[in-house]
């Protein structure tokens, strides 16, 4: 078997000899002019003669950076198949290969495969032709990284300062970097100038990939203190596509002088600057410079300044502020970079509101007499600002001002009186003080009038409940003129201090004449009331019923006695019958059961113990 190179040589010789056998024809070769793939993908380069000659040989040549050509492989058609030969892979891993369709296969494309590949077709008499296919390998860069300047940048600098450096690594082709401020693209040139510019540097890595770094320089202003910055890397993809990778956003630390100072009371206060005595009061001072300067707090004492505190936070707390701490306070911003025209000292006047405990001109329990007048109670309220005073009783205002006048005092006047003092300009600053008014006097009595059940008059035996209510001080005692079922009762009247007693009894004729009285008494006197019942009707209907009941009872008793007698006289027939008839028959001899003329118990029905009952007046007129 001949080696491949020998066979190829014979084929070339055959094609060369056949080229002289006839006229040379024109030959055309078809290859993809540009092949674009992502790094790591496979490339298959196809080369086809358009005229389809019967015998031909094609070769793949690699054009290096200097333009020199290097033979990589050759392909011979054998019927419907192709015989490929790799002549030189030039150290590539994995090496080139020819597939079953006669294509040059470049596996796992790398950036180094970006070359021109020339396909040369030799077809003997048909001629020789070639075509070039350019391979482009794209690689997406790594995530975009930004390194901001972590120092403090001064807005007073007259030149652009370094803002940040942005990096986009290992991409192909070389990516492009743009800068953004607050989401808007910055149009900065590459040339050095005082307002802003950027520089860039490209590095080709050992892998053949490219890394790009860009540094941004800007002249900063105070308005940039809250600005956000970021960068973005733009890269190309196959088929004219593009990609973008944004970095994270960042902010800068700027140094700028103070232009304005504010000083105010931070804790709850009124618009007039009042604060409550005893509260923790915060004084806040704020300058708009950066970084935060020192704040010096002081209090004016005549023509002198009393130094209170120096800090970087800009706040001063007065714990449990006292009325003596009212006065003028100041804050000084220690910023030596500030313009001379800037007012770095601010002052305010602190007003400490207070309200002393209220003082009443009467003790906590105060007594007056019923119907008295001219009593005055004074409520003394001292505070700043001047408090407003009013008197209330049962949450109802009874007097405006510190003076409470008690005139025409009644028992309803008794109760709890409260003096309320408040300062409308200072919320929650208020005080109260109360006293108990006691009204002394003879009892006041109120009866609960009653009406007959029938509506017009009382009937003897009706049950009635009488109620008397009284009030006074000391508490009165309620007594009744009649005995009965006495119980405490709920007062039926509205008002303060009432007490009640109820008496339950039956109506009689005697009550109608005398009446029933209740009396309330205490050390100051007594008061009474008599309940009258008017005429009391007798129980007529009930008397008739009683008489009838007695008559029926007597009749029943007589019948029982008669029945008993008849039972005793069963031995004498006709006796009871004669007794039932009106006239006695002619007398006949009487025989007892024992045969004697006189029965043993005859005396039971006779008028006397002698038994002489015949025609006598002491019995029922007959033995029967």
Curated annotation (Swiss-Prot):
PROSITE patterns: IG_LIKE. Keywords: Cell adhesion, Cell membrane, Disulfide bond, Glycoprotein, Immunoglobulin domain, Membrane, Phosphoprotein, Receptor, Repeat, Signal, Transmembrane, Transmembrane helix. GO terms for molecular function: laminin binding; laminin receptor activity. SMART domains: IG, IGc2. Residues 565-624 are cytoplasmic. InterPro entries: CD80_C2-set (IPR013162), Ig-like_dom (IPR007110), Ig-like_dom_sf (IPR036179), Ig-like_fold (IPR013783), Ig_sub (IPR003599), Ig_sub2 (IPR003598), Surface_Rcpt/Adhesion_Mol (IPR051116). Residues 26-136, 141-251 form the Ig-like V-type domain. Coiled coil: none annotated. It comes from the Eukaryota. Residues 1-25 form the signal peptide. Disulfide bonds join 47-119, 166-231, 285-331, 379-419, 468-518. GO terms for cellular component: cell surface; plasma membrane. Residues 477-497, 574-624 are annotated as: Disordered. It is a single-pass type I membrane protein. Transmembrane glycoprotein that functions as both a receptor and an adhesion molecule playing a crucial role in cell adhesion, motility, migration and invasion. Extracellular domain enables binding to extracellular matrix proteins, such as laminin, integrin and other ligands while its intracellular domain interacts with cytoskeletal proteins like hemoglobin, facilitating cell signal transduction. Serves as a receptor for laminin alpha-5/LAMA5 to promote cell adhesion. This is Basal cell adhesion molecule. It comes from Rattus norvegicus. The gene is Bcam.
